[in-house]
Amino acid sequence: MLDTLLINIGQLLTMDQEDGLLRREAMNTLPVIENGAVGIENGVVTFVGTAEEAKGLQAKEVIDCDGKMVSPGLVDPHTHLVFGGSRENEIALKLQGVPYLEILEQGGGILSTVNATKQASKEELVQKAKFHLDRMLSFGVTTVEAKSGYGLDDETEWKQLEATAQLQKEHSIDLVSTFLGAHAVPKEYKGRSKEFLQWMLDLLPEMKEKQLAEFVDIFCETGVFSVEESKEFLLKAKELGFDVKIHADEIDPLGGAEAAAEIGAASADHLVGASDKGIEMLANSNTVATLLPGTTFYLNKESFARGRKMIDEGVAVALATDFNPGSCPTENIQLIMSIAMLKLKMTPEEVWNAVTVNSSYAINRGDVAGKIRVGRKADLVLWDAYNYAYVPYHYGVSHVNTVWKNGNIAYTRGEQSWSTATI
């Protein structure tokens, strides 16, 4: 007997069309079962099909979804989850046109977050991050990548990674930990970036032994770390057994996209300034392009990543919030879906694949997350919508009704008035 059987699902988005990264037309294809049903037993999906096919199945609990839509739990593959403080005091300065470097000189910017993170205890960081994870869950996210990077010293970086490890044990969301010690060059290492990177590399063996990080990341940008420094750093991290990511070409076409493809990074993230050559190299690689349009939006920039061109040329594109206190303070992945549709010219189908299948591969979870398939853990979302296009269309709010994590209800909004949109 099943533990739970979901029936009368108007649209069941299984996302289960093929294994591996989705590109081109596959990104614009959604496997949808009309009038679907899903069976769950011991936290695992044991049945996926139509309501007609589900007849005769018995379950301890039968949930009538009343024609609403069900999808896999969403995957957010790029966040800066663990940090201290906030930076709302900088908004007025930005609106006045105060340059970021001047804000830094006043103790603001990333330095403000670094100082707040250093001053916070691990438990304070954990409790703050739990609040943000709860919000992510309420938006339908069940798997999250979490970066360090607000320490710029060994003690605080360890504290962030240990906080992430504790959160993995205490929160229902699955976390994937990334070491981003190379987020910026500390003042004391100004002009000595290679020495700083060596210091960060020296931390990796113990980090690997304690299993505190799965990925290593670096911020490759003008005035931070060069392409050659980034490649050398990440290749050494790979030699130590880590998978790697790269903050690439966020502002300038520095060659970060090319570097990511060349070294076989799991993902290249941002890519607003990615060159045509970089896009071509990504298309011919297994590196996921993780685009962060919420950051461009919040920074009030006019130029967004060329998501349409990337998809048309065969790049596997994912979407993420880039949740962080400075350049994208939002946990709302649904808002990111809407911005991607409007500003990156992605179709609703492409947007859904970018927050499920491709985003799972960006963090090496393609075999466990992002799809509804028999044998996989039951991470499911019941939406207050009748069709998938309605979610990114009706922007700025959450359409989530209920979230199941490993077959258990992890979030429910309860009885609400909801859309009567039809296809």
From Swiss-Prot:
Keyword Metal-binding among record annotations: yes
Entry GO MF terms: imidazolonepropionase activity; iron ion binding; zinc ion binding
Organism, as annotated: Bacillus mycoides (strain KBAB4)
Cofactor or coenzyme needed: Zn(2+); Fe(3+)
Any one of the GO CC terms: cytoplasm
InterPro entries per the UniProt record, alphabetical: Amidohydro-rel (IPR006680), HutI (IPR005920), Metal-dep_hydrolase_composite (IPR011059), Metal_Hydrolase (IPR032466)
GO biological process: L-histidine catabolic process to glutamate and formamide; L-histidine catabolic process to glutamate and formate
Binding site for N-formimidoyl-L-glutamate: 150, 324, 326
Record bears the keyword Zinc: yes
Residues reported in the UniProt entry to bind Fe(3+): 78, 80, 247, 322
Encoding gene per record: hutI
EC number: 3.5.2.7
Binding of 4-imidazolone-5-propanoate, residues: 87, 150, 183, 250, 327
Top-level division of the source organism's lineage: Bacteria
Protein family: Belongs to the metallo-dependent hydrolases superfamily. HutI family.
Keywords, comma-separated and alphabetical: Cytoplasm, Histidine metabolism, Hydrolase, Iron, Metal-binding, Zinc
Cofactor stoichiometry and binding remark: Binds 1 zinc or iron ion per subunit.
Cross-referenced NCBIfam families: hutI (TIGR01224)
Enzyme class: hydrolase
Protein's UniProt name: Imidazolonepropionase
Subcellular location as annotated: Cytoplasm
Pathway: Amino-acid degradation; L-histidine degradation into L-glutamate; N-formimidoyl-L-glutamate from L-histidine: step 3/3
Catalytic activity as recorded in UniProt: 4-imidazolone-5-propanoate + H2O = N-formimidoyl-L-glutamate
